């Protein structure tokens, strides 16, 4: 006889990065604490530290449906209900001020850790149920919801685990086959933002150095692209 106690929630959010944590906080407010957040790492928002070159690129000045693919009508409706201004106001209410630089939105501290600290404190103040080092290996669809790892039942699931781009942060695509078995469809994933490899002997001493500069790419004598940053 199996006497294992199954914990029940209204909603389970899988993935405790920026999107997952913010989503869980807002849902927890709306559903009176009936939300759990499942994160495989030993701390929340682990990947945020790498965004914006360590400065935390929260958002951009211009955010609209033209920057998304897929169901444009859905994106437009979502952005109408929760706009970029809504996000900035949320952080302001949490005590985090922001600044704009070249169309990008950063915390005024220019430290990605500020974002992590604010979101973690907000989650704690809202008594959000957070399960760290929780690795989701199985999801079963049941009559009135979903069973996760045969021990957590929830009526709804929100998946915020990213793609396959950063395995060292836990973003390795492990949930994709599980979600496919549930009938979810995925487009093929390809590397889109990758490094350029060069001979390192002449630039080795520049490692870690940050400098405002222009960089131009040429194909022979033909200028292909110039980037400032």
Set out the residue ranges of the language-model regions.
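Beta1/beta-strand and adjacent pyrophosphate-binding region of the FAD-binding site
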Residues: 5-19
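Predominantly flavin-linked oxidoreductase catalytic cores and closely associated redox partners
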Residues: 114, 121-229
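Glycine-rich active-site loop/strand segments that organize a redox cofactor
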Residues: 52-102
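Short beta-strand to alpha-helix junction loop
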Residues: 75-83, 102-121, 164-171
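Hydrophobic anchor at the start of a short beta-strand
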Residues: 11, 33-35, 98, 157, ...
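Short glycine/serine/threonine-rich phosphate/pyrophosphate-binding segments
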Residues: 20-23, 161
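Glycine-rich FAD pyrophosphate-binding loop
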Residues: 12-14, 28-53
């Amino acid at each position: 006889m199996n006497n294992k106690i199954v914990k029940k929630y209204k909603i389970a959010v899988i993935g405790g990065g920026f999107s997952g944590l913010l989503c869980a906080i807002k849902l927890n407010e709306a559903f009176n604490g009936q939300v759990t957040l499942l994160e495989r790492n030993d701390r929340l928002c682990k990947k945020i530290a790498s965004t914006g070159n360590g400065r935390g690129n929260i958002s951009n000045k211009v955010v609209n449906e033209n920057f998304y693919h897929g169901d444009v009508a859905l994106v437009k409706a979502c952005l109408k209900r929760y706009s970029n201004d809504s996000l900035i106001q949320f952080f302001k209410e949490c005590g985090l001020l922001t600044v704009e630089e070249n169309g990008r939105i950063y915390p005024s501290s220019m430290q990605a850790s500020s974002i992590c600290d604010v979101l973690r404190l907000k989650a704690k103040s809202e008594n959000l149920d957070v399960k760290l080092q929780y690795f989701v290996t199985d999801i079963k669809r049941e009559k009135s919801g979903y069973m996760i790892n045969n021990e957590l039942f929830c009526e709804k699931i929100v998946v915020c685990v990213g793609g396959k781009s950063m395995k060292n942060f836990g973003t390795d695509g492990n949930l994709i086959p599980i979600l496919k078995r549930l009938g979810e469809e995925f487009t093929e994933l390809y590397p889109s933002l990758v490094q350029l490899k060069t001979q390192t002997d002449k630039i080795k001493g520049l490692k870690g150095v940050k400098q405002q500069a222009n960089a131009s790419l040429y194909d022979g004598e033909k200028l292909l692209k110039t980037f400032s940053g």
